[in-house]
Structure formats: C-alpha cells, structure tokens
C-alpha cells in the first residue's frame, strides 16, 4: 500500500543519515484530528523534538495545530500529498515541505495503460510516477 511504501521510504532515508534519532512512530490513520492528538502526545513525551514527518498532509496539518507557534520555527514538519492546505502551510512557512504526487501524470499514465488493454496489448502491472518535493523554493509552481 502507499502507506507502507511511504513508511519504508522514510526508514530507508533515515538510515542513510547518522545522528537522527527517531523518538516515536505512531499511526494517525491519515486523519487530521488523530494527527493533532498523536502530535500532542509526542510533544508531551518529547518536548525537544526537532521534526515531524507525516505520511499525508492531513496528519501534518494536525501536527501543525499541536505545535502552534513552534511550527516552522522550532520544529520542522513535512507532509505528503501536496494538498491545497499543505501547499499553503509550506508557503506561509509553517511546514518545511510536502511531497507532491503528480495527478496529471498519474491520470495520463493510467489512460495509456488502459488504451494498451483495449488494443489487446499487455499493460504494466505497476507504473511508477515520480513525486516532487515542494518547499518554499518551488511552492508557487504547484499552487
């Protein structure tokens, strides 16, 4: 699933960097309110946390609520999906980045594969589409 792949990608990237200590991992079921609750508990248990990675923007936005004024200054937050609210949070500096999917490319590739099937050709079982890190440097390109 996308959730497992996002989590595995996070683990793989973290393993490449010494000195990063992951203090907690907890699901929030891709829900903003649960993201708020999880982040609140995390901050109570680990008040010196420096960063929060959420597997979607909804959970990241919940973490931003829990952080209040600390968001983007004392604690960096990264979300995933490139949603409208996630992009706004990046633009105003509360969120460091969101990992944006490319829905136009996903749709185009899906149509290409469906057309192959309609012609009786073999279609790819999986068609990877690159994601894009959206930060303050390029957020204007995605709004």
Residues of each region from the PLM?
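Structured segments of extracytoplasmic/periplasmic soluble domains
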Residues: 13-17, 41-45, 66-70, 89, ...
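Short beta-strand elements at the ligand-binding edges of bilobed clamshell
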Residues: 25, 92-104
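Hinge/cleft segment of the Venus flytrap/periplasmic-binding protein
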Residues: 2, 12-16, 102-143
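Hydrophobic alpha-helical
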Residues: 10, 24, 28-88
């Amino acid at each position: 699933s996308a959730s497992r792949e996002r989590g595995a990608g996070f683990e793989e990237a973290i393993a490449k960097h010494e000195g990063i200590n992951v203090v907690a991992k907890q699901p929030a079921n891709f829900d903003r309110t649960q993201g708020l609750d999880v982040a609140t508990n995390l901050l109570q248990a680990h008040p010196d946390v420096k960063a929060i990675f959420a597997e979607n923007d909804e959970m990241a936005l919940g973490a931003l609520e829990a952080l209040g004024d600390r968001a983007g200054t004392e604690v960096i937050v990264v979300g995933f999906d490139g949603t409208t609210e996630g992009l706004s949070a990046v633009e105003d500096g509360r969120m460091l980045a969101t990992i944006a999917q490319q829905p136009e490319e996903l749709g185009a590739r899906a149509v290409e594969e469906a057309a192959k099937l309609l012609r009786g050709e073999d279609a790819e079982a999986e068609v990877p589409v690159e994601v894009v890190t959206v930060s303050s440097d390029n957020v204007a390109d995605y709004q």
